[in-house]
Regions:
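Bacterial N-terminal signal peptides
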Residues: 5-17
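Terminal presequence/propeptide segments associated with secretion/organelle targeting
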Residues: 2, 18-626
Length: 626
Protein backbone atom coordinates (compact mmCIF):
# COMPACT_ATOMS: atom_id res chain seq x y z
CA UNK A 1 0.00 0.00 0.00
CA UNK A 2 2.90 2.40 0.78
CA UNK A 3 4.37 1.76 -2.66
CA UNK A 4 0.98 2.47 -4.32
CA UNK A 5 0.51 5.69 -2.33
CA UNK A 6 4.04 6.82 -3.17
CA UNK A 7 3.40 6.19 -6.86
CA UNK A 8 0.20 8.25 -6.74
CA UNK A 9 2.01 11.09 -4.96
CA UNK A 10 4.82 11.14 -7.53
CA UNK A 11 2.38 11.09 -10.47
CA UNK A 12 0.29 13.87 -8.92
CA UNK A 13 3.38 15.97 -8.22
CA UNK A 14 4.49 15.52 -11.82
CA UNK A 15 1.08 16.66 -13.00
CA UNK A 16 1.22 19.70 -10.77
CA UNK A 17 4.56 20.76 -12.28
CA UNK A 18 2.89 21.52 -15.60
CA UNK A 19 3.26 25.25 -16.26
CA UNK A 20 0.72 25.64 -18.99
CA UNK A 21 -1.97 22.95 -19.29
CA UNK A 22 -3.53 21.70 -22.49
CA UNK A 23 -6.88 19.94 -22.89
CA UNK A 24 -7.25 17.29 -20.19
CA UNK A 25 -4.34 18.69 -18.14
CA UNK A 26 -4.08 20.82 -15.02
CA UNK A 27 -3.38 24.41 -16.06
CA UNK A 28 -1.19 26.85 -14.15
CA UNK A 29 -0.40 24.69 -11.12
CA UNK A 30 3.12 25.10 -9.69
CA UNK A 31 3.09 23.65 -6.20
CA UNK A 32 2.31 20.35 -4.51
CA UNK A 33 -1.11 20.07 -2.84
CA UNK A 34 0.03 17.30 -0.53
CA UNK A 35 1.18 19.48 2.34
CA UNK A 36 -0.81 20.93 5.21
CA UNK A 37 -4.59 20.92 4.83
CA UNK A 38 -5.95 24.44 4.33
CA UNK A 39 -7.02 26.12 7.57
CA UNK A 40 -8.52 29.38 8.75
CA UNK A 41 -6.40 32.43 9.46
CA UNK A 42 -8.67 34.58 11.53
CA UNK A 43 -12.45 34.52 11.78
CA UNK A 44 -14.39 32.29 9.31
CA UNK A 45 -16.51 34.17 6.78
CA UNK A 46 -20.21 34.86 7.21
CA UNK A 47 -22.65 32.20 6.05
CA UNK A 48 -24.08 32.82 2.55
CA UNK A 49 -27.79 33.49 2.08
CA UNK A 50 -30.29 33.20 -0.74
CA UNK A 51 -30.22 35.85 -3.42
CA UNK A 52 -27.99 37.03 -6.22
CA UNK A 53 -24.29 36.28 -5.71
CA UNK A 54 -21.23 37.54 -7.59
CA UNK A 55 -19.52 34.85 -9.69
CA UNK A 56 -15.84 34.04 -10.08
CA UNK A 57 -15.36 32.87 -13.66
CA UNK A 58 -13.10 29.96 -14.53
CA UNK A 59 -10.86 32.34 -16.47
CA UNK A 60 -10.10 34.06 -13.17
CA UNK A 61 -9.17 30.88 -11.30
CA UNK A 62 -5.55 30.77 -10.11
CA UNK A 63 -3.65 28.05 -8.22
CA UNK A 64 -3.19 28.79 -4.55
CA UNK A 65 -6.38 30.79 -4.14
CA UNK A 66 -7.94 30.39 -0.71
CA UNK A 67 -11.67 30.02 -0.30
CA UNK A 68 -14.46 28.50 1.73
CA UNK A 69 -17.04 25.77 1.10
CA UNK A 70 -20.26 25.32 3.05
CA UNK A 71 -21.79 21.96 3.92
CA UNK A 72 -23.71 20.30 6.77
CA UNK A 73 -21.85 17.86 9.01
CA UNK A 74 -24.58 17.49 11.65
CA UNK A 75 -28.05 18.93 11.99
CA UNK A 76 -29.38 21.44 9.47
CA UNK A 77 -26.85 24.30 9.71
CA UNK A 78 -23.98 24.36 7.19
CA UNK A 79 -20.43 24.82 8.46
CA UNK A 80 -17.49 26.49 6.71
CA UNK A 81 -14.74 24.33 5.20
CA UNK A 82 -11.36 25.85 4.21
CA UNK A 83 -10.53 25.36 0.51
CA UNK A 84 -7.31 25.75 -1.45
CA UNK A 85 -7.54 25.88 -5.25
CA UNK A 86 -5.09 23.49 -6.94
CA UNK A 87 -5.80 24.41 -10.55
CA UNK A 88 -8.11 24.21 -13.53
CA UNK A 89 -8.45 20.88 -15.31
CA UNK A 90 -9.61 21.81 -18.79
CA UNK A 91 -12.12 19.68 -20.71
CA UNK A 92 -11.83 17.04 -17.98
CA UNK A 93 -15.56 16.29 -17.92
CA UNK A 94 -16.35 16.66 -21.60
CA UNK A 95 -16.03 19.28 -24.34
CA UNK A 96 -15.82 22.72 -22.69
CA UNK A 97 -16.61 21.06 -19.35
CA UNK A 98 -13.78 22.20 -17.10
CA UNK A 99 -13.25 20.98 -13.55
CA UNK A 100 -11.59 22.97 -10.77
CA UNK A 101 -9.38 20.85 -8.52
CA UNK A 102 -9.22 21.85 -4.87
CA UNK A 103 -8.11 20.59 -1.49
CA UNK A 104 -10.41 20.70 1.54
CA UNK A 105 -9.44 21.31 5.16
CA UNK A 106 -11.25 21.51 8.47
CA UNK A 107 -13.70 18.71 9.21
CA UNK A 108 -13.61 17.62 5.55
CA UNK A 109 -9.93 16.72 5.95
CA UNK A 110 -11.03 14.19 8.57
CA UNK A 111 -14.14 12.83 6.83
CA UNK A 112 -12.75 13.08 3.27
CA UNK A 113 -15.02 14.01 0.35
CA UNK A 114 -18.27 12.36 1.49
CA UNK A 115 -21.36 11.26 -0.33
CA UNK A 116 -23.97 13.96 0.22
CA UNK A 117 -21.44 16.81 -0.09
CA UNK A 118 -22.32 17.10 -3.77
CA UNK A 119 -23.38 20.67 -4.43
CA UNK A 120 -21.56 22.26 -1.49
CA UNK A 121 -20.92 25.85 -2.67
CA UNK A 122 -17.35 27.15 -2.87
CA UNK A 123 -16.57 30.86 -2.53
CA UNK A 124 -13.33 32.76 -3.16
CA UNK A 125 -13.16 36.39 -2.02
CA UNK A 126 -16.94 36.35 -1.57
CA UNK A 127 -17.57 35.22 -5.14
CA UNK A 128 -19.31 31.92 -5.97
CA UNK A 129 -16.92 29.55 -7.77
CA UNK A 130 -19.04 26.42 -8.12
CA UNK A 131 -20.10 23.20 -6.38
CA UNK A 132 -18.07 20.37 -4.92
CA UNK A 133 -19.13 17.48 -7.15
CA UNK A 134 -16.29 15.07 -7.87
CA UNK A 135 -13.69 13.08 -6.05
CA UNK A 136 -10.35 11.78 -7.27
CA UNK A 137 -9.68 8.10 -6.63
CA UNK A 138 -10.15 6.39 -3.28
CA UNK A 139 -7.89 5.65 -0.32
CA UNK A 140 -6.37 9.13 -0.66
CA UNK A 141 -5.14 10.64 2.63
CA UNK A 142 -6.06 14.10 1.32
CA UNK A 143 -9.55 15.48 0.71
CA UNK A 144 -9.07 16.35 -2.98
CA UNK A 145 -12.24 17.26 -4.84
CA UNK A 146 -13.42 18.43 -8.23
CA UNK A 147 -15.58 21.56 -8.41
CA UNK A 148 -18.20 22.06 -11.12
CA UNK A 149 -17.97 25.73 -12.18
CA UNK A 150 -21.12 27.70 -11.39
CA UNK A 151 -21.14 28.93 -15.00
CA UNK A 152 -21.92 25.40 -16.16
CA UNK A 153 -24.60 24.93 -13.52
CA UNK A 154 -26.38 28.15 -14.49
CA UNK A 155 -26.72 26.78 -18.02
CA UNK A 156 -29.34 24.34 -16.66
CA UNK A 157 -31.88 27.18 -16.73
CA UNK A 158 -31.53 27.47 -20.51
CA UNK A 159 -31.85 23.75 -21.29
CA UNK A 160 -34.94 22.57 -23.16
CA UNK A 161 -37.32 19.75 -22.19
CA UNK A 162 -35.44 17.01 -24.05
CA UNK A 163 -34.37 13.90 -22.17
CA UNK A 164 -30.71 12.81 -22.20
CA UNK A 165 -29.81 9.50 -23.81
CA UNK A 166 -27.62 8.27 -20.94
CA UNK A 167 -30.24 8.29 -18.19
CA UNK A 168 -29.69 6.19 -15.08
CA UNK A 169 -32.82 4.07 -14.82
CA UNK A 170 -33.59 0.57 -13.54
CA UNK A 171 -33.98 -0.64 -17.15
CA UNK A 172 -30.94 0.92 -18.78
CA UNK A 173 -28.83 -0.01 -15.75
CA UNK A 174 -26.17 2.45 -16.84
CA UNK A 175 -22.93 2.10 -14.95
CA UNK A 176 -21.63 5.05 -13.00
CA UNK A 177 -19.74 7.52 -15.18
CA UNK A 178 -16.01 7.42 -14.46
CA UNK A 179 -13.56 9.68 -16.26
CA UNK A 180 -9.94 8.51 -16.14
CA UNK A 181 -7.35 11.28 -16.56
CA UNK A 182 -4.30 10.55 -18.75
CA UNK A 183 -2.16 7.81 -17.24
CA UNK A 184 0.97 9.82 -18.04
CA UNK A 185 -0.25 12.52 -15.68
CA UNK A 186 -1.90 10.94 -12.69
CA UNK A 187 -1.13 7.24 -12.89
CA UNK A 188 -3.35 4.23 -13.46
CA UNK A 189 -4.76 4.17 -9.94
CA UNK A 190 -6.38 7.62 -10.03
CA UNK A 191 -9.73 8.53 -11.58
CA UNK A 192 -12.34 11.23 -11.48
CA UNK A 193 -15.85 10.19 -10.39
CA UNK A 194 -18.99 12.03 -9.31
CA UNK A 195 -19.42 11.97 -5.55
CA UNK A 196 -21.97 9.33 -4.64
CA UNK A 197 -25.50 10.55 -4.08
CA UNK A 198 -26.64 8.36 -1.18
CA UNK A 199 -30.09 6.96 -1.90
CA UNK A 200 -31.53 6.76 1.60
CA UNK A 201 -34.28 4.18 2.16
CA UNK A 202 -36.36 4.61 5.32
CA UNK A 203 -38.93 2.03 6.39
CA UNK A 204 -37.19 -0.71 4.40
CA UNK A 205 -35.97 -4.07 5.64
CA UNK A 206 -32.32 -5.00 5.46
CA UNK A 207 -33.30 -7.95 3.27
CA UNK A 208 -34.85 -5.53 0.75
CA UNK A 209 -31.64 -3.51 0.47
CA UNK A 210 -29.64 -6.72 0.14
CA UNK A 211 -31.85 -8.22 -2.57
CA UNK A 212 -32.02 -4.97 -4.58
CA UNK A 213 -28.35 -4.07 -4.19
CA UNK A 214 -27.45 -5.39 -7.69
CA UNK A 215 -30.02 -3.01 -9.22
CA UNK A 216 -28.62 -0.03 -7.34
CA UNK A 217 -24.97 -0.89 -8.00
CA UNK A 218 -25.50 -1.21 -11.75
CA UNK A 219 -27.09 2.25 -11.74
CA UNK A 220 -24.15 3.69 -9.83
CA UNK A 221 -26.34 4.39 -6.80
CA UNK A 222 -25.25 3.89 -3.20
CA UNK A 223 -28.31 2.65 -1.27
CA UNK A 224 -28.13 3.17 2.49
CA UNK A 225 -30.51 3.00 5.41
CA UNK A 226 -32.00 6.42 5.95
CA UNK A 227 -34.73 8.09 7.88
CA UNK A 228 -37.47 10.67 7.77
CA UNK A 229 -38.68 13.05 10.44
CA UNK A 230 -42.11 11.44 10.49
CA UNK A 231 -44.11 10.06 7.58
CA UNK A 232 -44.73 12.73 4.93
CA UNK A 233 -48.00 11.96 3.14
CA UNK A 234 -48.62 15.38 1.59
CA UNK A 235 -46.56 16.56 -1.38
CA UNK A 236 -47.61 20.20 -0.94
CA UNK A 237 -44.79 22.52 0.16
CA UNK A 238 -44.64 22.94 3.93
CA UNK A 239 -45.22 26.37 5.52
CA UNK A 240 -42.07 28.47 5.49
CA UNK A 241 -40.81 27.11 2.19
CA UNK A 242 -39.87 30.66 1.19
CA UNK A 243 -36.87 30.53 3.55
CA UNK A 244 -35.87 26.93 2.84
CA UNK A 245 -32.78 25.50 1.14
CA UNK A 246 -30.21 28.20 1.76
CA UNK A 247 -26.77 27.68 0.16
CA UNK A 248 -24.88 24.89 1.93
CA UNK A 249 -27.99 23.24 3.39
CA UNK A 250 -28.98 19.65 2.64
CA UNK A 251 -31.39 19.08 -0.27
CA UNK A 252 -33.18 15.84 -1.13
CA UNK A 253 -34.90 14.56 -4.24
CA UNK A 254 -37.85 12.43 -3.11
CA UNK A 255 -38.71 9.27 -5.04
CA UNK A 256 -41.04 7.80 -2.39
CA UNK A 257 -42.58 9.53 0.64
CA UNK A 258 -44.93 8.30 3.34
CA UNK A 259 -44.69 5.10 5.36
CA UNK A 260 -41.69 4.26 3.18
CA UNK A 261 -39.23 6.89 2.00
CA UNK A 262 -36.63 6.89 -0.78
CA UNK A 263 -34.57 10.07 -1.11
CA UNK A 264 -31.35 11.19 -2.76
CA UNK A 265 -29.29 13.58 -0.64
CA UNK A 266 -27.03 16.42 -1.77
CA UNK A 267 -26.29 20.05 -0.97
CA UNK A 268 -27.69 23.38 -2.18
CA UNK A 269 -25.25 25.38 -4.31
CA UNK A 270 -27.28 28.46 -5.17
CA UNK A 271 -30.70 29.90 -4.30
CA UNK A 272 -31.98 32.99 -6.09
CA UNK A 273 -35.09 33.14 -3.91
CA UNK A 274 -37.24 30.98 -6.17
CA UNK A 275 -35.01 28.55 -8.02
CA UNK A 276 -32.40 26.30 -6.44
CA UNK A 277 -29.29 24.68 -7.93
CA UNK A 278 -27.56 21.71 -6.32
CA UNK A 279 -25.44 18.56 -6.57
CA UNK A 280 -22.98 19.85 -9.22
CA UNK A 281 -23.54 16.61 -11.11
CA UNK A 282 -26.62 14.71 -12.20
CA UNK A 283 -28.94 12.82 -9.86
CA UNK A 284 -29.99 10.26 -12.47
CA UNK A 285 -29.53 12.48 -15.56
CA UNK A 286 -33.24 12.22 -16.33
CA UNK A 287 -33.58 15.65 -17.93
CA UNK A 288 -36.91 17.38 -17.19
CA UNK A 289 -38.49 15.92 -14.06
CA UNK A 290 -41.36 16.61 -11.69
CA UNK A 291 -40.01 15.26 -8.39
CA UNK A 292 -40.73 16.44 -4.84
CA UNK A 293 -37.86 18.45 -3.35
CA UNK A 294 -37.24 18.37 0.40
CA UNK A 295 -35.02 19.67 3.16
CA UNK A 296 -32.66 17.33 4.96
CA UNK A 297 -31.19 16.92 8.42
CA UNK A 298 -27.76 15.30 8.69
CA UNK A 299 -27.22 12.88 11.56
CA UNK A 300 -23.50 12.29 11.00
CA UNK A 301 -20.78 11.97 8.40
CA UNK A 302 -19.12 8.57 8.34
CA UNK A 303 -15.39 9.15 7.82
CA UNK A 304 -13.64 6.83 5.38
CA UNK A 305 -10.87 6.92 2.79
CA UNK A 306 -12.91 4.50 0.70
CA UNK A 307 -16.56 5.62 0.75
CA UNK A 308 -17.44 8.31 3.30
CA UNK A 309 -21.14 9.15 3.45
CA UNK A 310 -23.61 11.43 5.13
CA UNK A 311 -26.46 9.82 7.05
CA UNK A 312 -29.53 12.03 7.01
CA UNK A 313 -33.28 12.31 7.42
CA UNK A 314 -35.70 13.94 5.02
CA UNK A 315 -37.72 16.56 6.88
CA UNK A 316 -40.17 18.70 4.87
CA UNK A 317 -41.13 18.97 1.23
CA UNK A 318 -40.59 22.56 0.10
CA UNK A 319 -40.82 22.44 -3.70
CA UNK A 320 -40.23 20.38 -6.81
CA UNK A 321 -37.19 19.44 -8.87
CA UNK A 322 -37.58 20.51 -12.50
CA UNK A 323 -34.27 19.56 -14.15
CA UNK A 324 -31.76 16.74 -13.63
CA UNK A 325 -28.76 17.39 -15.87
CA UNK A 326 -25.08 16.56 -16.27
CA UNK A 327 -23.93 19.61 -14.30
CA UNK A 328 -26.52 19.53 -11.52
CA UNK A 329 -30.16 19.68 -10.51
CA UNK A 330 -32.55 22.63 -10.55
CA UNK A 331 -35.63 22.95 -8.35
CA UNK A 332 -38.43 25.42 -7.81
CA UNK A 333 -39.38 26.46 -4.29
CA UNK A 334 -43.11 26.44 -3.51
CA UNK A 335 -43.99 24.22 -6.48
CA UNK A 336 -45.90 20.98 -6.00
CA UNK A 337 -44.78 17.86 -7.86
CA UNK A 338 -47.42 15.45 -9.08
CA UNK A 339 -47.03 11.96 -7.61
CA UNK A 340 -49.00 8.71 -7.48
CA UNK A 341 -50.74 8.06 -4.14
CA UNK A 342 -50.51 4.37 -3.29
CA UNK A 343 -52.49 2.50 -0.64
CA UNK A 344 -51.44 -1.05 0.28
CA UNK A 345 -53.34 -3.29 2.67
CA UNK A 346 -51.40 -6.33 3.85
CA UNK A 347 -53.24 -9.34 5.26
CA UNK A 348 -51.22 -12.16 6.81
CA UNK A 349 -52.46 -15.45 8.23
CA UNK A 350 -49.70 -16.67 10.58
CA UNK A 351 -51.39 -20.03 11.26
CA UNK A 352 -53.39 -22.06 8.70
CA UNK A 353 -57.08 -21.48 9.37
CA UNK A 354 -56.32 -18.76 11.92
CA UNK A 355 -57.30 -15.09 11.91
CA UNK A 356 -55.68 -12.57 9.57
CA UNK A 357 -53.44 -9.77 10.78
CA UNK A 358 -53.70 -6.52 8.83
CA UNK A 359 -51.37 -3.61 8.17
CA UNK A 360 -51.98 -0.54 6.04
CA UNK A 361 -49.34 1.44 4.16
CA UNK A 362 -49.68 4.79 2.42
CA UNK A 363 -47.04 6.48 0.31
CA UNK A 364 -46.51 8.61 -2.80
CA UNK A 365 -44.41 7.52 -5.77
CA UNK A 366 -42.38 9.68 -8.18
CA UNK A 367 -43.78 9.63 -11.72
CA UNK A 368 -41.35 8.58 -14.46
CA UNK A 369 -41.78 5.97 -17.23
CA UNK A 370 -38.72 4.02 -16.09
CA UNK A 371 -38.59 4.70 -12.37
CA UNK A 372 -42.28 4.32 -11.44
CA UNK A 373 -42.46 0.57 -12.26
CA UNK A 374 -39.24 -0.06 -10.35
CA UNK A 375 -40.44 1.86 -7.29
CA UNK A 376 -43.73 -0.07 -7.34
CA UNK A 377 -41.69 -3.27 -7.36
CA UNK A 378 -39.40 -2.08 -4.57
CA UNK A 379 -42.18 -0.97 -2.22
CA UNK A 380 -44.35 -4.04 -2.87
CA UNK A 381 -41.46 -6.39 -2.22
CA UNK A 382 -40.62 -4.54 0.98
CA UNK A 383 -44.15 -4.89 2.38
CA UNK A 384 -44.02 -8.60 1.61
CA UNK A 385 -40.91 -8.88 3.78
CA UNK A 386 -43.12 -8.12 6.78
CA UNK A 387 -45.11 -11.22 5.88
CA UNK A 388 -42.16 -13.33 4.92
CA UNK A 389 -40.56 -12.93 8.33
CA UNK A 390 -43.34 -14.91 10.01
CA UNK A 391 -44.41 -17.20 7.17
CA UNK A 392 -43.41 -20.77 6.54
CA UNK A 393 -41.22 -21.65 3.57
CA UNK A 394 -44.31 -23.00 1.82
CA UNK A 395 -46.40 -19.85 1.61
CA UNK A 396 -48.77 -18.46 -1.01
CA UNK A 397 -49.07 -14.77 -1.87
CA UNK A 398 -51.89 -13.00 -3.64
CA UNK A 399 -52.20 -9.45 -4.96
CA UNK A 400 -55.45 -7.74 -5.96
CA UNK A 401 -54.87 -4.24 -7.29
CA UNK A 402 -56.74 -1.35 -8.87
CA UNK A 403 -55.05 1.29 -11.01
CA UNK A 404 -57.11 4.42 -11.70
CA UNK A 405 -56.04 6.48 -14.72
CA UNK A 406 -57.44 9.71 -16.10
CA UNK A 407 -60.00 9.11 -18.85
CA UNK A 408 -60.05 5.31 -18.44
CA UNK A 409 -62.11 2.83 -16.44
CA UNK A 410 -60.37 1.44 -13.35
CA UNK A 411 -57.93 -1.32 -14.25
CA UNK A 412 -58.37 -4.32 -11.94
CA UNK A 413 -55.51 -6.82 -11.72
CA UNK A 414 -54.88 -9.95 -9.67
CA UNK A 415 -52.22 -12.62 -9.40
CA UNK A 416 -51.16 -15.40 -7.07
CA UNK A 417 -47.75 -17.02 -6.60
CA UNK A 418 -46.59 -19.86 -4.38
CA UNK A 419 -43.18 -20.53 -2.88
CA UNK A 420 -41.06 -22.82 -5.00
CA UNK A 421 -43.23 -22.31 -8.09
CA UNK A 422 -40.68 -20.29 -10.05
CA UNK A 423 -37.00 -19.47 -10.52
CA UNK A 424 -37.07 -16.67 -7.93
CA UNK A 425 -38.61 -16.26 -4.46
CA UNK A 426 -42.38 -15.85 -4.50
CA UNK A 427 -42.36 -12.27 -3.08
CA UNK A 428 -39.98 -11.17 -5.84
CA UNK A 429 -42.12 -12.89 -8.49
CA UNK A 430 -45.23 -11.07 -7.33
CA UNK A 431 -43.47 -7.70 -7.05
CA UNK A 432 -41.95 -8.12 -10.53
CA UNK A 433 -45.37 -9.02 -11.99
CA UNK A 434 -46.87 -5.88 -10.42
CA UNK A 435 -44.06 -3.70 -11.79
CA UNK A 436 -44.47 -5.18 -15.27
CA UNK A 437 -48.07 -3.94 -15.41
CA UNK A 438 -46.91 -0.37 -14.85
CA UNK A 439 -44.03 -0.80 -17.26
CA UNK A 440 -46.41 -1.85 -20.03
CA UNK A 441 -48.69 1.11 -19.35
CA UNK A 442 -45.83 3.61 -19.36
CA UNK A 443 -44.35 2.23 -22.59
CA UNK A 444 -47.52 2.85 -24.58
CA UNK A 445 -47.02 4.46 -27.96
CA UNK A 446 -49.46 7.34 -27.63
CA UNK A 447 -48.39 8.78 -24.30
CA UNK A 448 -47.98 8.05 -20.62
CA UNK A 449 -50.97 7.24 -18.39
CA UNK A 450 -52.17 9.88 -15.97
CA UNK A 451 -52.36 7.62 -12.93
CA UNK A 452 -54.60 9.15 -10.26
CA UNK A 453 -54.23 6.52 -7.54
CA UNK A 454 -53.26 2.92 -6.90
CA UNK A 455 -54.83 0.57 -4.37
CA UNK A 456 -53.78 -3.01 -3.68
CA UNK A 457 -54.40 -5.79 -1.18
CA UNK A 458 -51.57 -8.22 -0.48
CA UNK A 459 -52.47 -11.48 1.19
CA UNK A 460 -50.27 -14.25 2.57
CA UNK A 461 -51.34 -17.73 3.60
CA UNK A 462 -48.78 -19.94 5.36
CA UNK A 463 -49.25 -22.97 3.12
CA UNK A 464 -48.66 -23.76 -0.52
CA UNK A 465 -52.02 -23.45 -2.26
CA UNK A 466 -51.66 -25.22 -5.57
CA UNK A 467 -53.85 -27.77 -7.36
CA UNK A 468 -53.13 -29.86 -10.45
CA UNK A 469 -55.88 -30.97 -12.86
CA UNK A 470 -55.68 -34.78 -12.88
CA UNK A 471 -58.75 -35.70 -14.91
CA UNK A 472 -62.16 -34.47 -16.06
CA UNK A 473 -65.36 -36.00 -17.41
CA UNK A 474 -68.93 -35.15 -18.47
CA UNK A 475 -72.11 -36.73 -17.15
CA UNK A 476 -73.12 -37.49 -20.75
CA UNK A 477 -71.39 -37.80 -24.11
CA UNK A 478 -74.30 -36.42 -26.18
CA UNK A 479 -76.60 -33.44 -25.67
CA UNK A 480 -78.97 -31.25 -27.62
CA UNK A 481 -78.69 -27.45 -27.87
CA UNK A 482 -80.10 -25.84 -24.72
CA UNK A 483 -79.67 -28.94 -22.52
CA UNK A 484 -77.72 -28.82 -19.26
CA UNK A 485 -74.45 -30.74 -19.00
CA UNK A 486 -72.49 -31.43 -15.82
CA UNK A 487 -68.68 -31.41 -15.94
CA UNK A 488 -66.61 -32.77 -13.08
CA UNK A 489 -62.90 -32.17 -12.52
CA UNK A 490 -60.56 -34.09 -10.23
CA UNK A 491 -57.78 -31.96 -8.75
CA UNK A 492 -54.81 -32.90 -6.59
CA UNK A 493 -53.87 -30.17 -4.07
CA UNK A 494 -50.29 -29.83 -2.90
CA UNK A 495 -49.82 -32.53 -0.24
CA UNK A 496 -53.56 -32.96 0.04
CA UNK A 497 -56.33 -35.39 -0.76
CA UNK A 498 -57.92 -35.48 -4.17
CA UNK A 499 -60.93 -33.18 -4.55
CA UNK A 500 -63.68 -32.95 -7.17
CA UNK A 501 -65.24 -29.78 -8.54
CA UNK A 502 -68.56 -29.72 -10.39
CA UNK A 503 -69.57 -27.25 -13.09
CA UNK A 504 -72.94 -27.03 -14.85
CA UNK A 505 -73.44 -25.38 -18.22
CA UNK A 506 -76.00 -25.32 -21.02
CA UNK A 507 -75.12 -26.21 -24.58
CA UNK A 508 -75.35 -23.00 -26.69
CA UNK A 509 -78.54 -22.97 -28.74
CA UNK A 510 -76.70 -21.96 -31.91
CA UNK A 511 -74.06 -24.68 -31.66
CA UNK A 512 -74.10 -26.79 -34.86
CA UNK A 513 -74.45 -30.55 -34.79
CA UNK A 514 -71.36 -32.70 -34.56
CA UNK A 515 -68.50 -33.30 -32.16
CA UNK A 516 -67.10 -30.46 -30.10
CA UNK A 517 -64.46 -30.18 -27.41
CA UNK A 518 -64.80 -28.80 -23.90
CA UNK A 519 -61.54 -27.42 -22.51
CA UNK A 520 -60.85 -27.44 -18.77
CA UNK A 521 -57.77 -25.35 -18.01
CA UNK A 522 -55.95 -22.79 -15.94
CA UNK A 523 -55.60 -19.10 -16.86
CA UNK A 524 -52.14 -19.34 -18.42
CA UNK A 525 -53.29 -21.51 -21.32
CA UNK A 526 -56.07 -19.07 -22.22
CA UNK A 527 -53.98 -15.92 -21.72
CA UNK A 528 -51.11 -17.05 -23.92
CA UNK A 529 -52.49 -16.28 -27.44
CA UNK A 530 -53.59 -12.78 -26.50
CA UNK A 531 -50.30 -12.06 -24.72
CA UNK A 532 -48.27 -13.18 -27.74
CA UNK A 533 -50.43 -11.04 -30.03
CA UNK A 534 -49.74 -8.02 -27.84
CA UNK A 535 -46.00 -8.68 -27.89
CA UNK A 536 -46.04 -8.92 -31.69
CA UNK A 537 -47.20 -5.31 -31.89
CA UNK A 538 -44.75 -2.94 -30.23
CA UNK A 539 -46.89 0.06 -31.16
CA UNK A 540 -49.84 -0.51 -28.84
CA UNK A 541 -51.65 2.56 -27.57
CA UNK A 542 -52.53 3.18 -23.95
CA UNK A 543 -56.17 2.10 -24.33
CA UNK A 544 -55.14 -1.10 -26.11
CA UNK A 545 -52.52 -1.91 -23.48
CA UNK A 546 -55.00 -1.36 -20.66
CA UNK A 547 -57.54 -3.53 -22.49
CA UNK A 548 -55.00 -6.36 -22.82
CA UNK A 549 -54.18 -6.18 -19.12
CA UNK A 550 -57.86 -6.11 -18.16
CA UNK A 551 -58.56 -9.24 -20.22
CA UNK A 552 -55.96 -11.32 -18.39
CA UNK A 553 -57.59 -14.14 -16.46
CA UNK A 554 -56.74 -14.78 -12.84
CA UNK A 555 -54.54 -17.79 -12.17
CA UNK A 556 -56.50 -18.97 -9.11
CA UNK A 557 -59.56 -20.08 -11.07
CA UNK A 558 -60.64 -23.13 -13.06
CA UNK A 559 -61.88 -22.21 -16.55
CA UNK A 560 -64.32 -24.07 -18.81
CA UNK A 561 -64.33 -23.24 -22.53
CA UNK A 562 -65.97 -24.51 -25.70
CA UNK A 563 -63.64 -25.07 -28.66
CA UNK A 564 -65.01 -24.74 -32.19
CA UNK A 565 -63.24 -25.54 -35.44
CA UNK A 566 -63.40 -21.97 -36.77
CA UNK A 567 -60.16 -19.96 -36.60
CA UNK A 568 -59.62 -16.92 -34.38
CA UNK A 569 -57.26 -14.07 -35.17
CA UNK A 570 -55.80 -12.02 -32.32
CA UNK A 571 -55.02 -8.46 -33.39
CA UNK A 572 -53.56 -6.22 -30.68
CA UNK A 573 -56.11 -6.37 -27.85
CA UNK A 574 -59.06 -7.76 -29.82
CA UNK A 575 -59.86 -11.40 -30.74
CA UNK A 576 -61.59 -11.75 -34.13
CA UNK A 577 -63.62 -14.96 -34.20
CA UNK A 578 -65.02 -16.88 -37.18
CA UNK A 579 -62.67 -15.16 -39.63
CA UNK A 580 -63.27 -16.27 -43.27
CA UNK A 581 -60.37 -18.10 -44.90
CA UNK A 582 -59.84 -15.36 -47.50
CA UNK A 583 -59.59 -12.65 -44.85
CA UNK A 584 -57.24 -14.80 -42.78
CA UNK A 585 -54.95 -15.34 -45.78
CA UNK A 586 -54.82 -11.59 -46.45
CA UNK A 587 -54.01 -10.78 -42.82
CA UNK A 588 -51.18 -13.32 -42.75
CA UNK A 589 -49.68 -12.05 -46.00
CA UNK A 590 -46.18 -10.52 -45.73
CA UNK A 591 -47.63 -7.36 -47.29
CA UNK A 592 -50.13 -6.92 -44.48
CA UNK A 593 -49.39 -4.07 -42.10
CA UNK A 594 -51.39 -5.73 -39.33
CA UNK A 595 -49.50 -7.86 -36.84
CA UNK A 596 -51.90 -10.71 -36.14
CA UNK A 597 -51.70 -14.11 -34.52
CA UNK A 598 -54.03 -16.85 -35.79
CA UNK A 599 -55.31 -19.88 -33.89
CA UNK A 600 -57.01 -22.79 -35.68
CA UNK A 601 -59.83 -22.87 -33.12
CA UNK A 602 -62.15 -20.42 -31.43
CA UNK A 603 -62.39 -20.44 -27.63
CA UNK A 604 -65.84 -19.57 -26.28
CA UNK A 605 -66.01 -19.10 -22.50
CA UNK A 606 -68.55 -21.24 -20.64
CA UNK A 607 -67.71 -20.24 -17.08
CA UNK A 608 -65.21 -20.46 -14.25
CA UNK A 609 -64.85 -21.69 -10.67
CA UNK A 610 -62.82 -19.69 -8.12
CA UNK A 611 -60.57 -22.10 -6.21
CA UNK A 612 -58.45 -19.77 -4.07
CA UNK A 613 -55.33 -21.66 -5.12
CA UNK A 614 -53.00 -21.82 -8.08
CA UNK A 615 -54.24 -24.07 -10.87
CA UNK A 616 -52.02 -25.96 -13.31
CA UNK A 617 -52.75 -28.43 -16.08
CA UNK A 618 -55.62 -28.89 -18.51
CA UNK A 619 -58.00 -31.52 -19.87
CA UNK A 620 -60.05 -31.78 -23.09
CA UNK A 621 -63.48 -33.47 -23.18
CA UNK A 622 -65.60 -34.48 -26.18
CA UNK A 623 -69.28 -33.63 -26.49
CA UNK A 624 -71.49 -34.65 -29.40
CA UNK A 625 -74.29 -32.21 -30.19
CA UNK A 626 -77.38 -33.90 -31.63
Amino acid sequence: MKILEAAIFVCAAAACAVAQGTNGEIAGFRHSPYGEAPAWHGEPPARPAAGAAPILKTSEIRPGMKGVAWTVFQGAQPEPVPVEIIGLWKNAWGPRQDVILAKLGGKAAQTNVAGGMSGSPVYVDGKLVGAIALRISVFSPDAICGITPIEQMLEINAIDESRPLNQKTPQTLAARAELAPPASLLGGGVRLTPIETPLALAGFHESTLRDFRPFFEQMGVTAVHGGAAGAVYDTKPAPGWQNALQPGEAIAGVLVSGDMTVTGLGTVTYNDGKRVLGFGHSFFNLGPVDMPMAKGEVLMVLSSQFQPNKFANMTEIVGALRQDRHSGIMGELGAEAKTIPVSLKVRAQPIPGGPFEEKNYRFNVFIHPRWTPFLMMLTTYNTLQDLNSSAADEATYRLDGTVECEGMPPLRLSNMVASGAGPMPAPMQLAAWWADRFNRLYQSQDGEPQVKRVEAVLEMRPQKLEAVIESAWLDRSEAAPGEEVVARVALRPWRGERITQEFRFRVPSNLPRGEHRILVSNAELLNRPQAVAGLMNRQLGLAQTASLLAQERSNDRLYFSLLTSKPTVYVDDQPMRDVPASVLAAMQSPRSQQRAMAMPETVLPLGEIPLGSLVSGSAALRLKVQ
